[in-house]
């Protein structure tokens, strides 16, 4: 029995389609083969040292180069030495559930013994009339709890502001300092674990060009708080370049308490 094939004109009709199909497949495969493989982001080259730089925030936990930590310690020492020549105004504001509860001001300066001195300015805020009875007792207890929390918060902040060079050194020697590059060769954050108390983290954001501190981020356990508290410190600079903590902000959402501390009005301290 004789097989019947496709008419020649049918073959001529489908030939370009078949050839096109194979050519298309070949082009796709060739393109895929030639496409460059994805490569990780290139790390930035070190500026002046032989220590490798970290180029992305994904490098959290990488040991901090000794040069960076040394620069941080020197910056802290330099700023603190210069600030001992100044006096300034400190304004502390305590808030509860969005309402300002107290505002105090103090003139601050370093005494001859090297300790920070604070002299209250103005009258102490007047306390509200006490309520009597069971309700008054509840309010009184609540007020005492909040007052105690505020005192603990203030004490916690003092452990980190300003940073202490000797504690930075201790963290470095314990191998608990790490670095994250926020902006290659411009900004980095050095995280100091177990800086003041076990379980805390002091993050110091630095300008790598000037080696000045830009900000602090702190997470620390605190007496009277079930959860660790967090607060941020923004730094500014005097005309001579000396860095100082311009504003500290603690927001304890657990109890609705906020603490704001602002430093301003720096001037050379008058000595007798």
For each predicted feature, which ranges?
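Gly/Pro-enriched, hydrophobic low-complexity segments
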Residues: 181-272
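Solvent-exposed N-terminal domain segments of exported/luminal and surface proteins
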Residues: 76-137
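Flexible, processing/modification-adjacent segments and terminal tails
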Residues: 124-200, 220-225
């Amino acid at each position: 029995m004789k097989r019947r094939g496709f008419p020649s004109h049918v073959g001529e009709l489908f030939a370009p389609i078949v050839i096109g199909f194979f050519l298309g497949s070949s082009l796709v495969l060739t393109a895929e083969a030639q496409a460059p493989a994805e490569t990780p982001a290139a790390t930035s080259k070190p500026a002046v040292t032989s220590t490798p730089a970290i180029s992305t925030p994904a490098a959290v936990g990488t040991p901090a180069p000794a040069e960076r930590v040394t620069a941080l310690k020197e910056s802290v020492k330099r700023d603190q030495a210069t600030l001992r020549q100044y006096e300034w105004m400190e304004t502390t504001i305590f808030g509860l559930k969005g309402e300002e509860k107290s505002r105090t001001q103090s003139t601050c300066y370093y005494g001859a013994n090297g300790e920070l001195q604070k002299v209250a300015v103005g009258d102490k805020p007047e306390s509200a009339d006490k309520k009597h009875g069971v309700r008054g007792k509840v309010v009184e207890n609540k007020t005492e709890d909040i007052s105690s929390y505020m005192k603990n918060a203030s004490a916690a902040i003092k452990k980190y502001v300003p940073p202490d060079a000797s504690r930075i050194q201790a963290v470095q020697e314990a191998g608990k300092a790490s670095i994250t590059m926020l902006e290659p060769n411009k900004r980095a954050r050095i995280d100091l674990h177990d800086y003041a108390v076990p379980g805390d983290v002091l993050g110091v954001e630095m300008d790598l060009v000037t080696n000045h501190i830009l900000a602090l981020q702190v997470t620390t356990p605190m007496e009277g708080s079930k959860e660790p508290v967090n607060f941020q410190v923004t730094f500014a600079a005097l005309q001579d370049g000396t860095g100082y903590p311009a504003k500290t902000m603690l927001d304890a959402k657990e109890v609705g308490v906020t603490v704001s501390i602002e430093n301003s009005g720096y001037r050379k301290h008058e000595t007798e």
